[in-house]
A protein has these predicted regions:
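Extended, charge-enriched "interface" segments that sit outside catalytic cores
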Residues: 1-111
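Glycine-rich phosphate-binding loops that contact phosphosugars or nucleotide phosphates
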Residues: 97-100, 104, 113-211
């Protein structure tokens, strides 16, 4: 790194250790000597803040699907419209309770043992987000091992099934299917592959039939 680059980072970054948060805008078009009184910022900041307020208030951000952008409401449900905030808090509580039941063995496979694996089936952000969390925060102390069907490549899914087999098999694996729309064809393909693996257990007399 050159002295000029380091100087620019120092001039155009700010740290808030108590959060913790570091904001670095040194790679933007802002001049090194930029100040909050500059016309560029005087125009940009109000527009950015009003746009953020509109999104947080539930404005339609995807007109094609008539969808709002509220994923950050999961982290701060108090920002969501009242009825949505309550629904988010109740849903998060149910998810946490279900996870606790899986960890404790209250929700368990037919073998009577606990689930040791989770297979997540999803495409795009539906799998990329969980993969990021698993890679960033996972450790050897995790109670469940994570596996992913994140595309429709048959060889890729076969390799992941081999990894699951080496980790105790599909009979000890809880499968989670994630789709924003509920109708993603690629996700359905992965779900059918997982379903076929469970059906094979039934054929082998190692499980009960399911729909």
């Amino acid at each position: 790194m050159t002295d000029a680059s380091l100087s620019r980072i120092r001039s155009l970054s700010a740290a808030a250790p108590s959060v913790p948060l570091l904001v670095d805008v040194s790679r933007t078009c802002l001049p090194t000597h930029a100040k909050t009184s500059d016309p560029l910022l005087l125009e940009a900041f109000p527009a950015a803040f009003s746009g953020m307020a509109a999104l947080e208030g539930g404005a339609i951000a995807n007109p094609d699907e008539k969808r709002r952008v509220g994923h950050y409401w999961l982290r701060a449900p108090e920002l969501a419209p009242e009825h949505l905030g309550q629904a988010i808090e109740e849903t998060v509580a149910r998810v946490k309770a279900f996870a606790a039941d899986v960890h404790s063995g209250k929700v368990a496979p037919e073998s009577g043992k606990r689930f040791t694996n989770v297979l997540l089936v999803g495409i795009g952000g539906s799998s990329l987000g969980p993969q990021l969390v698993a890679d960033a925060l996972g450790s050897g102390e995790d109670k469940l091992r994570l596996f992913f069907f994140d595309n429709t490549d048959p060889d890729g899914m076969a390799r992941e099934m081999d990894r699951i087999a080496a980790a105790g098999g599909i009979r000890h694996t809880l499968t989670v299917v994630v789709s924003k729309s509920g109708g993603t064809k690629e996700t359905r393909n992965g779900m059918l592959v997982a379903q076929a693996a469970y059906t094979a257990l039934v054929s082998a007399g190692l499980g009960e039939a399911f729909n």
